[in-house]
């Protein structure tokens, strides 16, 4: 069927709109329909996406903008295709909504050469890249214990207020500084204030012009929040497939994507599944995640913030996401409460490339030793709480002292936290990270007090801080 068929609205239920077409002109599922509404003297275009065919020449659609002002009998135009978004170099330094409209045009008439549908198939198997390569971030706790994969999918898990968005912003800054390339950011159902902060920080850091941003924020309809990640992913796919660039895709927050799917599912009348989630949760997640991949020589590396409701990792939303990830960075409220940032839980975080064949024997040996010391310290904490540290054996006392140094050394001064701490951010090369933790595990740093390890970069920073502390103590 070609576009330009005209239908009429017969029902409006929140953000779900039923539209009647003549029998020979029914639009296909995922087709974009357009209608206009007058609000405060201003004509606004509303996009509807077909979700279901109800029979009797009716289609059920999901609105991408507020449905305020829509009335029964109003005309709706079938565009004959899916929602499309602009792609290419002109998208850099621009902020878009879900349907590809520029939000920071400042009155300019911006032209784009090419538009792509947001509903695309994942790359064919023959085009996929099988090589596994470590993606160095310069953040010690990540590079050592939960190494990221170039072209992989990385999840930042955590409850409210433990630092997911700050870590995403930190990674955007580091990638632009150290790796070059293009970044695409999808703001899915998060706070508008965070979007404003992110844009200002990126402008201050000089990375805004290398990034395309797509926002569907908390105050927007569920249809917008469900599709905005696909809009951003489409822009990232263009940079990978046409311009042959390595791309970083940041999604904040995947839980809001799932939540939006649940809202849309309920509005469409589907029977809910476990804990009230949509019955097609795994399918919706798969459609998004399967497109985030590496093709021959070029990659999309995605960093996804994932809110964990009530810190419950068995909730279907985070549990469904786990299956797709190459590395998980779990942020801990307990570690954040100690003032140690990034608040990464070193024992709960995982990576599929924490294996000597991918990262080398030295890196693997040091990572395992660090985890063993931290695990032993965790087991001894209950004994220490009841009997005190003096009741431990000499060997266990040494283990606890080294674990505390390791815990402090896993914290790091980040670029994004400078405005809070006044301390410049640091990027620590991987080999320096491995050597530093190896020295602590061997006992080479047993003479240095643990406060010298707090919020520093490499071992050189520790020694400088220790010298400063000695001078202060006289």
UniProtKB/Swiss-Prot annotation:
The record ties this protein, via CDD domains, to: ATP-synt_F1_beta_C (cd18110), ATP-synt_F1_beta_N (cd18115), F1-ATPase_beta_CD (cd01133)
Q: Which UniProt keywords apply?
A: ATP synthesis, ATP-binding, Cell membrane, CF(1), Hydrogen ion transport, Ion transport, Membrane, Nucleotide-binding, Translocase, Transport
- What's an example of a GO molecular-function annotation for this chain? ATP hydrolysis activity
Q: Which GO terms describe its cellular component?
A: plasma membrane; proton-transporting ATP synthase complex
- Extract the PROSITE patterns matched here: ATPASE_ALPHA_BETA
EC number(s) per entry? 7.1.2.2
Location in the cell reads: Cell membrane
Q: Where does ATP bind?
A: 158-165
Give the record's membrane topology.
Peripheral membrane protein
Domain of life (superkingdom): Bacteria
Query: Which enzyme type, at the first EC level?
Result: translocase
* Entry-linked InterPro entries: AAA+_ATPase, ATP-synt_VA_C, ATP_synth_F1_bsu, ATPase_a/bsu_AS, ATPase_alpha/beta_chains, ATPase_F1/V1/A1_a/bsu_N, ATPase_F1/V1/A1_a/bsu_N_sf, ATPase_F1/V1/A1_a/bsu_nucl-bd
Catalytic reactions of this protein: ATP + H2O + 4 H(+)(in) = ADP + phosphate + 5 H(+)(out)
Name the job this protein performs.
Produces ATP from ADP in the presence of a proton gradient across the membrane. The catalytic sites are hosted primarily by the beta subunits.
Q: Which family does it belong to?
A: Belongs to the ATPase alpha/beta chains family.
Q: How does it assemble?
A: F-type ATPases have 2 components, CF(1) - the catalytic core - and CF(0) - the membrane proton channel. CF(1) has five subunits: alpha(3), beta(3), gamma(1), delta(1), epsilon(1). CF(0) has three main subunits: a(1), b(2) and c(9-12). The alpha and beta chains form an alternating ring which encloses part of the gamma chain. CF(1) is attached to CF(0) by a central stalk formed by the gamma and epsilon chains, while a peripheral stalk is formed by the delta and b chains.
User: HAMAP family annotated for this entry?
Assistant: ATP_synth_beta_bact (MF_01347)
Query: What protein name does the entry list?
Result: ATP synthase subunit beta
Protein encoded by which gene:
atpD
């Amino acid at each position: 069927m070609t576009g330009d068929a005209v239908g009429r609205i017969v029902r409006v239920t929140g953000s779900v709109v039923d539209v009647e077409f003549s029998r020979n002109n029914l639009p296909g599922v995922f087709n974009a329909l357009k209608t206009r509404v007058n609000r405060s003297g201003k004509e606004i275009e509303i996009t509807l996406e077909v979700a279901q065919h109800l029979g009797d020449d009716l289609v059920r659609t999901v609105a991408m903008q507020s449905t305020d002002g829509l009335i029964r009998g109003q005309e709706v135009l079938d565009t004959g295709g899916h929602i499309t978004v602009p792609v290419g170099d002109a998208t850099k330094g621009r902020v878009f909504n879900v349907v590809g409209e520029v939000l920071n045009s400042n009155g300019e008439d911006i032209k784009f050469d090419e538009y792509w549908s947001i509903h695309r198939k994942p790359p064919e198997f023959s085009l996929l890249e099988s090589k596994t390569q470590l993606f160095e971030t310069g953040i010690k706790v990540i590079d050592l214990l939960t190494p990221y994969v170039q072209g992989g999918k990385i999840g930042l898990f955590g409850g409210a207020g433990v630092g997911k968005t700050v870590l995403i912003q930190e990674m955007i800054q580091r990638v632009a500084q150290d790796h070059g390339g293009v970044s695409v950011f999808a703001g899915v159902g998060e706070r508008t204030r965070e979007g404003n902060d992110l844009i200002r920080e990126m402008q201050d850091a000089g990375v805004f012009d290398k990034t395309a941003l797509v926002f569907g924020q908390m105050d927007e309809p569920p249809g917008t929040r469900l599709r905005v990640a696909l809009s951003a992913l489409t822009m990232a796919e263009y940079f990978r497939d046409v311009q042959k660039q390595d791309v970083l895709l940041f999604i904040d927050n995947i839980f809001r994507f799932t939540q939006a799917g649940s809202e849309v599912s309920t509005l469409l009348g589907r029977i809910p599944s476990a804990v009230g989630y949509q019955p097609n949760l795994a399918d919706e997640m798969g459609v998004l995640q399967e497109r985030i991949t590496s093709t021959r020589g070029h990659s999309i590396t995605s960093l996804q913030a994932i809110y964990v409701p009530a810190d419950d990792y068995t909730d279907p939303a985070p549990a469904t996401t786990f299956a797709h990830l190459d590395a998980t960075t779990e942020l801990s409220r307990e570690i954040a409460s100690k003032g140690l940032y990034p608040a990464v839980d070193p024992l709960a975080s995982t990576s599929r490339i924490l294996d000597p064949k991918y990262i080398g024997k030295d890196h693997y040996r040091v990572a395992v030793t660090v985890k063993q010391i931290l695990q032993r310290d965790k087991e001894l904490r209950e004994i220490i709480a009841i009997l005190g540290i003096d009741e431990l054996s000499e060997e266990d006392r040494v283990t606890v002292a080294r674990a505390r140094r390791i815990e402090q050394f896993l914290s790091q001064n980040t670029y994004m936290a400078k405005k809070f701490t006044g301390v410049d951010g640091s990027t620590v090369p991987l080999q320096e990270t491995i050597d530093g933790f190896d020295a602590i595990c061997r006992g080479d740093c047993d003479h240095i007090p643990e406060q010298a390890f707090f919020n520093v970069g490499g071992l050189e920073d520790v020694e400088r801080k220790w010298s400063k502390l000695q001078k202060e103590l006289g």
